[in-house]
Design a protein with these regions (language model features):
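Active-site metal-binding core of divalent-cation-utilizing nuclease and nuclease-like domains
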Residues: 5-47
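Short, solvent-exposed loop/turn segments that connect beta-strands within catalytic domains
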Residues: 45-49, 119-122
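A short acidic (Asp/Glu
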Residues: 64-66, 110, 136-145
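Polybasic (Lys/Arg-rich)
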Residues: 132, 141-190
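Short, solvent-exposed loop/turn segments at secondary-structure junctions
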Residues: 18-20, 46, 57-61, 132-136
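Extended hydrophobic secondary-structure segments that form protein cores and membrane-embedded regions
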Residues: 53-55, 126-133
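Acidic, metal/cofactor-coordinating or nucleic-acid-engaging core segments within structured domains
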Residues: 59-127
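Conserved catalytic cores of phosphodiester-cleaving nucleases, focusing on short active-site segments
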Residues: 39-43, 50-60, 109
């Protein structure tokens, strides 16, 4: 992001996680004890620099387990409480929805993007969560638990993968890719 600020896309994006999120566990890597984002796009609209974090979900299921512990509170509580995007829960951060999946992952991505903005690498961000329409349980969890905790809901959107990629329909250059994605992901969700 800081090497080529005019054009940027990254997969499994992580950025300054140790300094900004205190994610310094031994053996940490993207997705394991280290916040990562499936796709990060850097874009410009006028004079403004935008981040577009995209998290793809297909068949994941979660058990609703509270992941609150002292280390996570030390890392994330102050970021949640000072967040301009996330509401502070009425009964405090500990044992809140922010420590239950899928909100836990989305919270971490949100505070990482806020840190990128606060350190002037971008001006704002628009968060996308790609979930098949037929994955009711996951969509419902995000819609009913995470989205209500956002200060500005207009900067977070759930897309069905077919909807997101629909502009590519009919373009023969992408026929094989779309066929693969449909068979591999959204065609198989029950």
């Amino acid at each position: 992001i800081d090497e080529d600020p005019e054009s940027y896309i990254s997969f499994e994006f992580a950025f300054h996680n140790i300094e900004w999120l205190k994610e310094d566990d031994e053996g940490s890597r993207r997705g394991t004890m280290c916040t990562s984002i499936d796709v990060m796009i850097f874009a410009r609209k006028g004079n403004r620099k935008w981040l577009i974090p995209i998290e793809w979900k297909y068949t994941e299921t979660y058990n609703g387990k509270d992941k609150t512990n002292a280390k996570r509170m030390d890392r994330y509580a102050h970021l949640i409480e000072s967040s301009k995007r996330l509401k502070t829960p009425e009964h405090g951060v500990a044992h809140s929805i922010y420590f239950v999946e899928p909100s836990y992952e989305l919270m971490r991505q949100t505070v990482l993007c806020e840190q990128i903005v606060s350190h002037k690498f971008a001006d704002d961000f628009f968060h996308i969560n790609v979930i098949p329409r037929r994955h009711y349980e996951l969509r419902n969890a995000v819609e009913k638990e995470f989205i209500p905790m956002l200060e500005d809901k207009s900067k977070f959107k759930i897309f069905d993968p077919e909807e997101l990629l629909s502009p590519l329909n009919g373009n023969m250059a992408y026929d094989e890719l779309l066929k693969y994605l449909k068979e591999r992901y959204w065609g198989s969700v029950k």
